[in-house]
Amino acid sequence: MSSAGAVDLSLKIGALRLRNPILAASGTFGYGLEFAHLVELERLGGFVTKGLSREPIEGAPAPRLCETPSGMLNAVGLQNVGVRAFVAEKLPVLRKFDTAIIANVFGYTLEDYVEVLRVLEDADGLAGYELNISCPNVKRGGMQFASDPASVAEVVRAARSVVAKRPLWVKLSPLVTDIGLIARAAEEAGADALTVANTYPAMAIDYRTGKSRLGNQTGGLSGPAIKPITLRLVWEARKAVKTPIVGLGGVETVEDVLDYLAVGASAVQVGTASFLTRRPVSDLLRVLKVSFVDVIRLLSMRYEVNFSQKTVDIMMFSCYTF
């Protein structure tokens, strides 16, 4: 317990200490600055920047977002200013906020990942990195880096070779036959933590025109629809590795957070919920009153779930979403 009787929800993901287990997910929080007037960034456990590439990317054609009955489709196309512009223009402002800033990194070749990380390693103000390995490897016919253990190990080892200062998280794809094998490959190659998981390829059609509702034809499905599937992935990954896991997919309520902790995640990221409500994710920490002992118990449960023994004390969760 901290002063004034406040519950201390701080934790460590590997070597990285977070104020609490709630982070803003990559792609839904921009560079953080866009939400600074709405969200007290210091109240978040941290936030993950939108993906950073070697060179600027304009992204996919509009429309880029499409709401579904149970979530959202996005096809932003990884638009970003490029790593050098991020370091020169965005990061100096972000350094003013007392929160963990995790840079999401992607590429289409091993050299892309290495170059982006080299630039970031020379910059101050970052707490760690998250590798998005769901991108196509252009040197292997467009096959995703995340699709097989050998490719995963290759890209993580390449990243690890240039990352000395900060923790390295790896964001896994849900489109794999055995998430345990993929998770183990990332762990053995040097990942400090795993983010499980990315969005699911999907589509929405306007039957009146016969055309996709997205400019890029297909997009990534996120939101409540994917939570049960991703919970299973976290559970399977937890059985395969000892590396900390950050759960991501359909987190909207206090119960969602606790569900992810119960199947073995150490923390969660909130994404689509940031688009669907005006109440910022940091509000969770204002209305949530959790027994410190029970949070620790959930964090130590790993993948063994016993719902009959769940005794977490939640205040007002029944009417709260964020």
Tell what function each PLM region has:
Residues 1-101, 106-108:
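N-terminal capping/small domains of soluble enzymes
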Residues 19-23, 97-102, 163-173, 239-248:
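Short beta-strand/loop segments at the ligand-binding rim of alpha/beta enzyme cores
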Residues 60-69, 205-218, 273-296:
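C-terminal helical cap(s) of enzyme catalytic domains, especially alpha/beta-barrels
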